[in-house]
Design a protein with these regions (language model features):
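Short acidic/polar hinge/loop motifs at secondary-structure boundaries
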Residues: 1-16
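Surface-exposed loop/turn segments flanking beta-strands in extracellular/periplasmic regions
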Residues: 186-208, 252-276, 373-403, 450-472
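Outer membrane beta-barrel strand-and-loop segments of large Gram-negative receptors
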Residues: 224, 410, 429-476
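N-terminal periplasmic accessory domains that precede
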Residues: 1-2, 22-45
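Face-selective signature of the C-terminal outer-membrane beta-barrel domain
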Residues: 101-121, 139-320
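Transmembrane beta-strands of outer-membrane beta-barrel pores
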Residues: 48-52, 63, 74-80, 116-124, ...
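Structural signature of Gram-negative outer-membrane beta-barrels, strongest in the C-terminal barrel
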Residues: 279-429, 433-437
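Transmembrane beta-barrel wall of Gram-negative outer-membrane proteins
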Residues: 43-78, 85-167
Length: 476
């Protein structure tokens, strides 16, 4: 609901069975949404209930004799998932411009369908009404996303063996910010590690209440490029279609990440260190696919076969990674046998059986490929002076920093096969599917043991009466 409006949706296609080799990262079919690209009258819609208020307006324009269409629409949504809890509510604004242009020539036709979209989800400064210090505790979040797409489609009416050539490209930029202010009340004097370098350093005590400011800033950018060709041959009792292509995906976050004061963390148990999202390398995937679809007419029976394969490769990584530049092949296959129609009460009853097998490769995400550095803060001295805690207390820490990156990560491979039976009669369909899915690998974090050396200072040896400042380590 935060990013998608239903007013500009023309059709929704649900593809069952093992997905085509054209699509990656899918195991159980696909939902394909097409947006309106045609002349439409000016429409406005308003909806209000106990959970939301929605207003949208849109219109489609066409230029006669020029094969040109322009669709413009926008909307506003005020969502209240729980009207009693304003922390769960949000507002969304969306705007979309879509163009469709057709060029006709003797040997070819080209359709150009670009679009520009904006979505913004924003929340005003909010407080928890159940807190007595609500004037201090507050947060504000904002989400803004703009995207551009360019789609080209060529058809060749005079060529029997080549059907279409498609070239699709898109780029999107997003800004996602969360600002939070929180009153922290430590139950006791707590240590806040502040060192960003390995070695010995003094930490900071959290003695009393303080106000923590926190910012999470994300600016992800995504790019996509895909080229595809479709081919076909037909005979008296068969039809063969084939398609081949490739695609490239790029994802990079240019945000500041988590920004906060190490000496005043958002939680007294916080032990991590800030890391800019922009320091994390981009994620790039390169894929190619090849697939054939065959239809055979066997008397009054019909047999459809779909066989294909898809390769998936992660690129742009360090050579230390096992995944870098290594292709993984995903085979996909589907078959369907349709029996002759059976007349029942003057109507046709259709029965078919289907089956399929497919492999899907799931690459690790950024948090597994580029995890945060692990900080091990060991307290060597924890001296708290009861008389002058601010002036004479001292906490000494040795910090170890470990790179926990696993350069030998392998992708997860999901194997699935299924068998399905379908019965349809007068627009009604009964479908029964049995499937078996086998995923024996995946990604998770695990602990490890390692020795660390440190000094243990005996704070009982400190002579509190003779202190003129924090105790010196040399005297303990």
């Amino acid at each position: 609901m935060r990013t998608l409006t239903t007013d500009d949706i023309e059709s929704v296609e649900i593809v069952r069975g093992i997905p085509s080799a054209e699509y990656g990262n899918l195991t159980s079919g696909m939902v394909n949404i097409k947006r309106v690209r045609k002349a439409t009258p000016l429409t406005a819609r308003f909806k209000a209930d106990e959970y939301s208020k929605l207003f949208s307006v849109g219109k489609g324009f066409t230029v006669p004799n020029h094969d040109f269409t322009l669709n413009v629409d926008g909307g506003f949504l005020d969502s209240k998932v729980d009207p009693r809890n304003n922390l769960e509510n949000y507002k969304r604004v969306n705007f979309s411009v879509r163009i469709s242009k057709l060029w006709r020539r003797d040997k070819w036709e080209m359709t150009w369908t670009p679009s520009a979209d904006y979505t913004g989800s924003f929340d005003n400064v909010k407080t928890d009404p159940d807190l007595s210090y609500q004037k201090i505790d507050k947060y504000k979040s904002s989400y803004n996303r703009a995207s551009l797409t360019n789609n080209f489609k060529w058809t060749f009416p005079r060529l029997k063996w080549i059907k279409t050539v498609n070239l699709d490209a898109s780029v999107s930029a997003q800004s996602d910010q969360l600002k939070r202010t929180k009153l922290i009340s430590p139950q006791r004097a707590t240590v806040a590690p502040t060192g960003k370098e390995p070695g010995v350093h003094d930490g900071t005590y959290l003695f009393s209440e303080y106000v923590a400011d926190y910012l999470c800033d994300g600016k992800p950018v995504n790019a996509f490029l895909k080229a595809k060709g479709e081919f076909g041959w037909e005979g008296a009792k068969y039809r063969l279609n084939a398609k081949a292509g490739g695609e490239w995906n790029y994802s990079k976050n240019f945000g500041k990440g988590q920004v906060y004061d190490l000496s005043h963390p958002i939680s007294t148990s916080w032990g991590a260190r800030p890391r800019a999202y922009s320091d994390i390398p981009a994620l790039q995937n390169l894929s190619f696919f090849l697939e054939g679809n065959t239809l055979f007419l066997l008397g009054k029976n019909k047999l459809e076969l779909q066989v294909g394969a898809r390769s998936v490769t992660q690129i742009g990584m360090s050579e230390r990674y096992l995944l870098q530049g290594k292709p993984y092949i995903d085979p996909r296959a589907n078959a369907q046998w349709s029996f002759p129609a059976i007349p029942v009460a003057g109507k046709d009853l259709h029965i078919s059986i289907s089956g399929g097998y497919g492999v899907t490769t799931k690459m690790p995400t950024l948090d597994y490929l580029y995890p945060d550095l692990w900080y091990n803060d060991i307290v060597q001295l924890n001296y708290y002076d009861v008389n002058k805690p601010l002036e004479y207390s001292r906490v000494n820490i040795i910090t170890y920093i470990e790179d926990i990156t696993n350069y030998d990560l392998k992708p997860a491979r999901n194997h699935k096969w299924e068998v399905r039976g379908d019965i349809s009669f007068e627009g009604n369909r009964l479908s029964v599917t049995y499937f078996h899915e086998n995923l024996t690998s995946g990604f998770r974090t695990s602990s490890f043991y390692a020795p660390f050396s440190y000094r243990k200072y005996d704070h009982s040896a400190v002579d509190a009466s003779g202190l003129q400042g924090p105790p010196a380590l040399e005297n303990i």
